[in-house]
C-alpha cells in the first residue's frame, strides 16, 4: 500500500517559503520519496500504519495551502503509466511481497 501526498503551498512571502521548506523536509525525514515537485509517496504495511502517517501529516501541515493524501494498493501503484519522461530507479516499483536483493 502506498500513501501519496499532493501539496500546493504558497511561496510568495519569505514566511511562505519557510513553511514550504519545513513541510518538504518533514516529508523527506518521514521516509517519503519525491515523485514530482509537489508529489511524495511512501510505502506502508497496513491501514493502521497509514492512519498514523496521516495524523502525523495533519500535525505537521503548513498553516496555508492545500495538502491532499491518497492511498493506493501496490498493485494499483505498479500500474502507473509514465507518459513522458523516465522513472527514477532509486526504489523498487513492484507489487511482490518478497523482494530478494
Curated annotation (Swiss-Prot):
EC number(s) on file: 3.1.-.-
Domain of life: Bacteria
Organism: Treponema denticola (strain ATCC 35405 / DSM 14222 / CIP 103919 / JCM 8153 / KCTC 15104)
Chain positions recorded as Mg(2+) binding sites: 8
Coiled-coil segments on the chain, per record: none
Protein name: CRISPR-associated endoribonuclease Cas2
Subunit structure, as described in the record: Homodimer, forms a heterotetramer with a Cas1 homodimer.
Entry keyword Zinc: no
Keywords: Antiviral defense, Endonuclease, Hydrolase, Magnesium, Metal-binding, Nuclease
Cofactor: Mg(2+)
HAMAP family: Cas2
Family indicated by similarity: Belongs to the CRISPR-associated endoribonuclease Cas2 protein family.
GO terms assigned for molecular function: metal ion binding; RNA endonuclease activity
Database matches in InterPro entries: CRISPR_associated_Cas2 (IPR021127), Virulence_VapD/CRISPR_Cas2 (IPR019199)
Keyword check for Cytoplasm: no
Function: CRISPR (clustered regularly interspaced short palindromic repeat), is an adaptive immune system that provides protection against mobile genetic elements (viruses, transposable elements and conjugative plasmids). CRISPR clusters contain sequences complementary to antecedent mobile elements and target invading nucleic acids. CRISPR clusters are transcribed and processed into CRISPR RNA (crRNA). Functions as a ssRNA-specific endoribonuclease. Involved in the integration of spacer DNA into the CRISPR cassette.
GO process annotations (BP): defense response to virus; maintenance of CRISPR repeat elements
Pfam families documented for this protein: CRISPR_Cas2
Cited SUPFAM superfamilies: TTP0101/SSO1404-like (SSF143430)
Top-level class of the enzyme under EC nomenclature: hydrolase
Amino acid at each position: 500500500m502506498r500513501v501519496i501526498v499532493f501539496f500546493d503551498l504558497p511561496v510568495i512571502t519569505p514566511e511562505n517559503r519557510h513553511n514550504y521548506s519545513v513541510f518538504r523536509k518533514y516529508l523527506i525525514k518521514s521516509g517519503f520519496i519525491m515523485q514530482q515537485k509537489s508529489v511524495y509517496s511512501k510505502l506502508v504495511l497496513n491501514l493502521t500504519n497509514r492512519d498514523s502517517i496521516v495524523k502525523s501529516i495533519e500535525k505537521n501541515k503548513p498553516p496555508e495551502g492545500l495538502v491532499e493524501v491518497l492511498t493506493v494498493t501496490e498493485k494499483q501503484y505498479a500500474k502507473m503509466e509514465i507518459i513522458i519522461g523516465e522513472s527514477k530507479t532509486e526504489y523498487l516499483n513492484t507489487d511482490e511481497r518478497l523482494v530478494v536483493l
